[in-house]
UniProtKB/Swiss-Prot annotation:
One of its GO terms (cellular component) is periplasmic flagellum. Component of the core of the flagella. This is Flagellar filament 35 kDa core protein. Belongs to the bacterial flagellin family. It is found in: Periplasmic flagellum; Periplasm. GO terms for molecular function: structural molecule activity. Pfam families: Flagellin_C (PF00700), Flagellin_N (PF00669). Coiled coil: none annotated.
Length: 283
């Protein structure tokens, strides 16, 4: 029987200390809901989890970018539909005045409407905007360098595409003459020429709208793909980083029992020197 070193108490204290640390770690996992709260918990798991988290955040933003692109195209296509309707009306008036039964006075009255419609084409081109960007004044035509028209549709560098919108002013659509005056229908011959000009303008608009429709569908498929990738990537990160709550509760219960028993055993070990004291009292 010795008194200078209480090895039982030392061993009990060591076990108690480690079990208390384990309880703290388990409680941290339960309170945060995450198995990995620091690199010390799982260094390799944390590294993989952080890479996955980077991709998850990037995919989520890329999906939003794609939806913004879809909104942009919808807005532009809506304005372009108005322009198309206006030119359809100009074409009808041109066909009407190509008929020789109308007097010069009649043609002048029709010309007033044609001129107003041409002005409306320019009004739409000047006022059609998305986030203060002019849509139809050539800012997004091929050859321009507007960085804002790059749609970034992926979580990584260079995963982007550019969309082009042609100039849709009356000048670009050839609805005005070289001197800036609107196209004229002052004679059956001029009215007949306007039919051809209207057809050419409508062809340009229809091609642009077809491009918009195709690109919109592409963005829609891209958004669906990004949503699927986002969900799968997030599930992968969750499996690595998140805590299994049922497993952690079982672990906490076990470790708490060990702490309680360790505390009791430490108390018992600290009682050993008292036995020596009682022995000495009997001398």
């Amino acid at each position: 029987m010795i008194i200078n070193h209480n090895l039982s108490a030392v061993n009990a204290h060591r076990s108690l200390k480690f079990n208390e640390l384990a309880v703290d770690k388990t409680m941290k996992a339960l309170s945060s809901g995450m198995r990995i709260n620091s690199a010390a918990d799982d260094a390799s798991g944390l590294a993989v989890s952080e890479k996955l988290r980077t991709q998850v955040n990037g995919l989520r933003q890329a999906e939003r970018n794609t939806e913004d692109g879809m909104s942009f195209i919808q807005t532009a296509e809506g304005f372009l539909e108005q322009t198309s309707n206006i030119i359809q009306r100009i074409r009808v008036l041109a066909i009407q005045t190509s008929n020789g039964i109308y007097s010069n006075e009649d043609r002048q009255l029709v010309q007033v409407e044609v001129s107003a419609l041409v002005d409306e084409v320019d009004r739409i081109a000047s006022q059609a905007e998305f986030n203060k960007f002019k849509l139809f004044e050539g800012q997004f035509a091929r050859g321009s360098r507007v960085a804002s028209m790059w749609f970034h549709m992926g979580p990584n560098q260079n995963q982007r595409e550019r969309f082009y919108i042609g100039t849709m002013t009356s000048k670009a659509l050839k609805l005005v003459k070289a001197d800036g005056r609107p196209i004229a229908i002052s004679s059956p011959g001029e009215a007949n020429d306007v039919i051809g000009l209207a057809d050419a303008a409508l062809t340009k608009i229809m091609k642009q709208r077809a491009d918009m429709g195709a690109y919109y569908n592409r963005l829609e498929y891209t958004a669906k793909g990004l949503m699927g990738a986002y969900e799968n990537m997030q599930a992968s990160e969750s499996r690595i980083r998140d805590a299994d709550m049922a497993e952690e509760v079982v672990s906490l219960t076990t470790k708490q029992i060990l702490v309680q028993s360790g505390t009791a055993m430490l108390a018992q070990a600290n009682m050993k020197p008292n036995s020596v004291l009682k022995l000495l009292q009997q001398i």
